[in-house]
Regions:
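Catalytic active-site module of serine/aspartate enzymes centered on a nucleophile-bearing elbow/loop
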Residues: 240-273
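Conserved hydrolase catalytic core segment
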Residues: 127-166
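C-terminal motif of bacterial Sec signal peptides marking the signal peptidase cleavage site
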Residues: 16-19
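Conserved HGGG/HGGXW glycine-rich cap/lid loop of the alpha/beta-hydrolase fold
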Residues: 46-100
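Bacterial signal peptide processing site
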Residues: 21-24
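Active-site loop/oxyanion-hole signature of alpha/beta-hydrolase fold enzymes
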Residues: 92-131
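Conserved loop-alpha-helix segment in the C-terminal half of the alpha/beta-hydrolase fold
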Residues: 217-247
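Flexible "cap/lid" loop of the alpha/beta hydrolase fold
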Residues: 157-187, 229
Length: 273
């Protein structure tokens, strides 16, 4: 599958995007320290009597945290995780209600989702610094987590993380409510999307890659341009951020896992002192 060239942050205008914020930072990232080589495959208490399932393998630092797309978990990374674990410690997990993790109750916002990840990393003894690799709706969680833990973020890779719905049709809204029968995460999807988008801010002078899909044959030119252009909003994470335009479907980790592995490896190499 062909890939167009990277688009440097310096040539991108944010005039088309609203709410783009930037926060001051000294650009520092913790010096890598040896991470525990101990493999993890189990469930860990995260409060409220719930457990979340996490798997980690490999050793080294920074640790790669794989954040799956909506209502997906560890299995999304089956073609990516083994090879990335040959490079450094790599962890994936099932969010509440997904896979082997306990369900949550109530309507869940961004703070609930980032809080689960924070508590899970502590319970499983997975220290930073981290490279966050997030697919689709998992990117909003990664955005919120990065905003809360800037000093621990060494790099970011986004896999077709869209901008939030601005005016969704009523039938879609009905499917995205917390109590919808298909909403196994009990996530307030629209609120999480907007909160994750609003959380965008400069994390530091770190390597960031935003992989955006143009949807290829059959998609309207307007749809292609809109998706790619809107996702440039994620480049605010770092002055070193770049965008890669992909000619795949939305599920990049399934359709072109080697490209994902390559991009993660390049980000890891760029974190080296």
């Amino acid at each position: 599958m062909s890939v167009r060239g990277r688009i440097p942050l310096g040539v991108i205008s944010f005039a088309l995007l609203s709410g783009c914020a930037s926060a001051p930072t000294d650009g520092s990232v913790p010096s890598p320290v040896p991470a525990s080589p101990t493999a993890v495959n189990g469930s860990f208490e995260v409060g409220e009597g719930r457990t979340l399932h996490m798997e980690c393998s490999g050793d080294g630092s920074p640790t790669v945290i794989l954040e799956a797309g909506d209502e997906s978990g560890v299995e999304e990374w089956s073609q990516v995780m083994p090879e990335v674990a040959d490079l450094t410690r790599t962890c994936a997990y099932d969010r509440a209600g997904v896979g082997q993790s306990d369900p949550a109750t109530g309507c869940r916002g961004l703070d609930d989702l980032t809080g689960d990840l924070d508590r899970l990393l502590a319970a499983a003894d997975v220290p930073g610094p981290y490279v966050l690799v997030a697919a689709s709706g998992g990117g909003y969680i990664a955005s919120g987590f990065a905003a809360e833990h800037r000093e621990e973020i060494a790099g970011v890779v986004f896999l077709d993380v869209p901008g939030p719905y601005l005016d969704p049709p009523p039938d879609l809204v009905a499917r995205l409510t917390c109590d919808a029968s298909t909403n196994i995460e009990r996530r307030d999807y629209l609120a999480v999307e907007h909160a994750g988008w609003d959380a965008r801010a400069e994390v530091g002078d770190i390597p960031v890659t935003v992989m955006s899909v143009d949807y290829g044959p059959g998609a309207s030119l307007e749809a292609e341009r809109t998706n790619v252009e809107v996702q440039r909003g994620w480049l605010v994470f770092s002055p070193r951020a770049t965008q890669v335009v992909m000619h795949t479907g939305h599920g990049i980790a399934y359709e072109d896992p080697q490209r994902v592995i390559d991009e993660i490896e390049m980000v890891l190499e760029a974190t080296s002192p």
